[in-house]
A protein has these predicted regions:
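Short C-terminal tail/terminal secondary-structure segment
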Residues: 2-6, 238, 249-262
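Canonical Rossmann dinucleotide-binding motif of NAD(H)/NADP(H)-dependent dehydrogenases/reductases
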Residues: 6-39
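Amphipathic alpha-helical dimer-interface segment in Rossmann-like NAD(P)H-dependent oxidoreductases
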Residues: 77, 118-140, 149-150, 182-186, ...
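Catalytic Tyr-X3-Lys loop
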Residues: 106-126, 143, 170-172, 177, ...
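A conserved structural motif in NAD(P)-dependent oxidoreductases
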Residues: 222-233, 244
Length: 262
C-alpha cells in the first residue's frame, strides 16, 4: 500500500455547494490542492472570497440555488456535460430563517419554521437525490454538513440579544441531516456511494465577531477555549472525499474543539 496516495484526488470530479462561503471556500481549496477537479457551486461568484493575486481555487463555477430542485439539476447536468460524471459532492450550502427577535420558539410561525428546516435539511436532501444518477455507475462520496446544534442544544444564555441567536428550526434541520446521512448511506451502498457527514462546532465568520462578550462566552464553551479557524474543517472533508475513508459510510466526524464532548 502506497499510503502517500490515499489522499490523492487526481481524476476526481468534486462539486462543492456553497463553495464561495467561509467554510465552503476552504473545502474548494483543499480538494484542489490534493489534485481534484473542483466545481464551485454557489449563488454568485464572490471574488472577495479569494485573496488578492491568488488564482481561483476551482476549475469551474456553476450558479446554483440549493433551495431549487431545478437549479440543482441544471448545476449537476452542466458538470456532467463538461466532465462526464461527479465523484464527490460536498453539501455545504444552507440558509436559515428566524434569527434575531424571531428566534424564540413561542413566537415562530409555521412558514419561518419550515423555511429554516428546509434550509438546513432540504438542501442536503435535494443535493443527494439529484447527484445519485451521476454516481450510480462508478460510485462516489457524498459529504453533508451537519452542526453541533444538530447534536446538542445551544446554550441560549450566552446569546442574549446577539443577532446570531440560534432559532429552533436550525438545530432541528441539522439533526435531520445527521439522520438522513445514515439513511442515505444504507440506501445508496448498493451503488458504491458512500455518504458521511462533518459536524462543525463554533466557526464564526470574522465579519461577525464584533460582540466581544459573546465571542468570549462562545469560545469558552469549547475544551480548547477558542473558535475554529475555517481551514480546520477542511481536513475532515478531504478525508471523506478521498480513498483514505474507503471503508467509512454513515459516519459523522465532529470538529468542535470538544464542545459536544462535555
Amino acid at each position: 500500500m502506497d499510503y502517500k496516495k490515499l489522499f490523492d484526488l487526481s481524476g476526481k470530479i468534486c462539486v462543492v455547494t456553497g463553495g464561495t462561503g467561509y467554510l465552503g471556500s476552504e473545502n474548494v481549496k483543499i480538494l484542489k490542492d490534493f489534485g481534484g477537479t473542483v466545481v464551485c457551486a454557489d449563488l454568485r461568484e464572490a471574488e472577495d472570497r479569494w485573496e488578492k493575486n491568488e488564482d481561483k481555487a476551482y476549475d469551474m463555477f456553476v450558479k446554483c440555488d440549493v433551495s431549487s430542485t431545478e437549479s440543482i439539476k441544471a448545476c449537476f447536468a452542466a458538470v456532467a456535460e463538461k466532465y462526464g460524471r461527479i465523484d464527490v459532492l460536498v453539501n455545504c450550502a444552507c440558509y436559515g430563517a428566524g434569527y434575531g427577535k424571531g428566534s424564540q420558539l413561542e413566537f415562530m410561525d409555521d412558514e419561518t419554521f419550515n423555511k429554516g428546516v428546509d434550509g438546513a435539511l432540504g438542501t442536503a436532501f435535494r443535493g443527494m437525490r439529484e447527484v445519485v444518477p451521476y454516481m450510480k455507475e462508478k460510485g462516489g462520496s457524498i459529504i453533508n454538513y451537519c452542526s453541533m446544534y444538530g447534536l446538542v442544544s445551544p446554550d441560549l444564555r450566552i446569546y442574549g440579544d446577539n443577532p446570531q441567536k440560534q432559532p429552533p428550526n436550525y438545530g432541528a434541520g441539522k439533526a435531520g441531516v445527521a439522520q438522513i446521512t445514515r439513511y442515505a448511506a444504507c440506501s445508496l451502498s448498493e451503488y458504491g456511494i458512500r455518504v458521511n457527514a462533518v459536524t462543525p462546532g463554533p466557526f464564526p465568520n470574522p465579519k461577525n465577531q464584533d460582540d466581544v462578550r459573546f465571542n468570549q462566552a462562545l469560545a469558552n464553551k469549547t475544551m480548547l477555549g477558542r473558535f475554529g479557524q475555517s481551514y480546520e474543517m477542511a481536513g475532515a472533508v478531504l478525508l471523506l472525499a478521498s480513498d483514505a475513508s474507503s471503508f467509512m459510510t454513515g459516519s459523522n466526524i465532529v470538529v468542535d474543539g470538544g464542545w459536544t464532548a462535555w
